[in-house]
Amino acid sequence: GELVGGEVKVGHNLEAILKGLDVDVYSVPSFIKLYDQVTAGIFLNNRTKRYWFDKNAESNCFMLYARDLLITWSQDKRYWRWNPFQEHGNTLEVAELIDVCWLNIVGNIETSVLSPGISYEAAFEVMLTNSASGWRIPVDVKLKMPDGSEQESQVNLQDKPRGVWFFISVGHFKISVGETIGNIEFSIVQHQEAKRGLLVKGLVIQPKQ
């Protein structure tokens, strides 16, 4: 973090992050007000992302909502539907899988906006509807670092609870000072059998609990 006005810390590379801001926080009268806003959380890029600063971990955190993710066929109403939902006093959008065989969901974040030295966890936040089907085969989840190193695992959604939000962990990582700068890619993939009834809220990136 960067020290502002004595002992108050704000997030690493905050200026670059705030370029995507939906509301101009620089119009606020003081850094303390700015600090309050970033610790509470602020929306970026037309409410497709949310940034907040974790005071305890002194770490930047992000939620990449479904509109910020690359979801194959998501613009085709035969396969996906976009539903409004309320969160943090704002109307956002969640993607609902109607019927698809080719499940491909990808999120990206630049290492430059994450806090160095923090052990992060990335996880997709999803829900299975009561009528969900086609999830007998596990989904492949993958985390790919800028240097090309990968973490890969399989997650069985068949036994997950219905009608509640839950997290699919993609992996853990840490940004070291001097490490390769670039994109980290997170994905859920499953190209077998027809699937339906998955709601995708987004991808959360925050300190490992």
Curated annotation (Swiss-Prot):
Single Gene Ontology MF annotation: carbohydrate binding
Transmembrane portions of the chain: none
Site (Important for carbohydrate binding): 102
InterPro entries found in the cross-reference section: PP2-like, PP2-like/Lectin
Keywords from the UniProt entry: Hemagglutinin, Lectin
Oligomer status and interactors: Homodimer; non-covalently linked.
Entry function: Binds chito-oligosaccherides. Has hemagglutinating activity towards rabbit erythrocytes.
Annotated protein name in UniProt: Lectin
Organism of this sequence: Luffa acutangula
